[in-house]
C-alpha cells in the first residue's frame, strides 16, 4: 500500500511542476544485516520520471525506521533543488518518533480493518502524526474506512495537540483509484502555512539540526570508544560474563562506566 500511495502522490506533485525525492528506508535483516531494497521497483512510473529521485536506504536495524544517513540525504536532496523530500519509513509502528523529529510534516498511513487502525492508536503514532491518512478507500472497504475515520477523529479530540497552531486531520484516499490524493497535498500546504505564519516551522527546523548533532555526536563517541582496543576487549569480556550469568547486567554497566571514567577522565 505504501509504494502505491507514494507513486500516486509523487506523480501528483510532478504534475504540479515540483521535483520530488523519495528516501525509501528499507527493512534490514536482523540476521544478515541485508535489506530488500525493493521499494524502487514497486514505483515504476515515479522511478522513470525525470523530476523524481528515489533512493532506497537500508534501515540498519533502527527501530524508528530511519537510516543513520537519512537526515544527511534529506539535506542533499534539498540542496540539489528537490522541492519535496519524502521519507518512507519501515512502517513497523515502533519508535516512529525518531522519524517525526527528522521531518517537517509526519503522515501516518493506515488501512482500515485487520486491526491496523487500532494499532495506530495503541502504538502512539497519533501523538506524533500531523496527518492521518486511511488508504484503500475503495471496493468493499468504504464502510471499514468510515468506521476507522470516526475512531481516529474521536481519539484526536482527547489527545493533546502536538502544535497549538494545527489540529491533525484524518483523511481518506484510494491510491489505487487515484482518489483523495490532492486533498492530502492541500492539507500539507495548509499545515506548512499555519506553522510558517507562527514561526513554529523555523523552530522545528532548528530542533532538527540540534537533534542531528546530538545523534551524530553519540555515534562518533561510540565509534571512538570501540576503536580503543582496551575498551573493546573489556567490553567483550563483560558481555561474556553477563551471558554466563557470572555478572549482572547492572553491575556490568557500572564496571564499564568506571572503566571509561578511568581511561578518559581521570
Predicted segment positions?
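Nucleotide-state-sensitive switch-loop elements of NTP-binding domains
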Residues: 4-95, 102-108, 114-117
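Canonical P-loop GTPase G-domain recognition
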Residues: 131, 137-197
